[in-house]
């Protein structure tokens, strides 16, 4: 409980109050869930099937470390090498900024690589709220997976380097598609973004302000936030202090007023009335926060 309170931010309340059931479904970014697929040959076949629908960007939110399965590895590499769409693959960045890439990255220089935010600066015990655009590694600038996706989809995109932004979980809903249903979404995938990853298993599940979400969904929402500049901006600290002072002042004044006007009223009723007024003021505070979130 203590950890939960320590990790709480006002933006969490804002996102929690958003009705996710009424959010529009994104018509630009989709997630293909390959949780049920356990071998690289089958994943390669799924990638090829997605590529046949002519998406603009295919993002692989899966790490492929080197191993002994040479035949499956060769099929996967051949598939990636023949796809005309822009392919973005995931990598991991350690605390000392060393990059862990998939085995095929050196052999396929046409692929774009981006580090995944879900394994960077976050742990399973903390709420995943933010994504980063880039990290600077000595003289090199490494781009994140969401940024690489956004740039592949919208090359003229403007972004801030080395920035950490809140993910907008309240803007759109990301449709998850099973491999068996890819053909049904052929028209919707055309010229759009398709993120392929484990979207329903516990292997890539993360705590967010709106509940548990998979890594591919978080990547998709981060990319959507970047593409449409729907970043959430938290209220400045100084304004929070001012509003906190005003709330406390109004609470004390209300208590004093009720005590003077209704001398026979017990203190419990006075306190409850004052709390009611304070709650109304808190809602005003939330409205102010809303304007800052979308400023």
Residue ranges and their predicted role:
Residues 178, 223, 293-295:
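A diffuse structural propensity rather than consistent per-protein peaks
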């Amino acid at each position: 409980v203590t950890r939960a309170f320590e990790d709480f931010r006002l933006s969490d309340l804002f996102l929690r109050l958003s009705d996710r059931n009424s959010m529009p479904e994104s018509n630009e970014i989709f997630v293909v869930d390959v949780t049920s697929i356990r071998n690289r040959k089958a994943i390669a076949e799924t990638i090829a099937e997605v590529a046949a629908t002519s998406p603009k960007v295919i993002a692989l939110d899966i790490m492929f470390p080197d191993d002994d399965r040479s035949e499956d590895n060769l099929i996967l590499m051949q598939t990636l090498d023949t796809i005309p769409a822009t392919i973005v693959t995931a990598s991991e960045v350690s605390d000392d900024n060393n990059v862990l890439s998939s085995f095929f990255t050196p052999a396929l220089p046409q692929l774009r690589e981006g580090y995944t935010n879900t394994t960077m600066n976050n742990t399973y015990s903390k709420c995943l709220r933010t994504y980063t655009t880039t990290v600077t590694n000595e003289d090199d600038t490494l781009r994140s997976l969401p940024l690489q996706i956004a740039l592949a989809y919208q090359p003229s995109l403007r972004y801030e380097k080395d920035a950490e932004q809140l993910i907008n979980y309240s803007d759109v809903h990301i449709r998850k598609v099973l491999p068996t249903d890819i053909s049904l979404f052929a028209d919707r995938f055309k010229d759009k973004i398709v993120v392929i990853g484990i979207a329903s298993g516990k292997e890539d599940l993360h705590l967010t302000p709106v509940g548990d979400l998979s890594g591919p969904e978080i990547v998709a929402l981060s990319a959507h936030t970047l593409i449409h500049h729907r970043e959430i901006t938290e209220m400045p600290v100084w304004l929070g202090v001012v509003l906190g002072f005003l709330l406390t002042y109004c609470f004390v004044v209300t208590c004093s007023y009720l005590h003077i006007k209704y001398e026979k009223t017990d203190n419990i009723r006075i306190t409850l009335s004052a709390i009611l007024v304070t709650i109304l003021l808190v809602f005003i505070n939330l409205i102010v926060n809303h304007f800052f979130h979308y400023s």
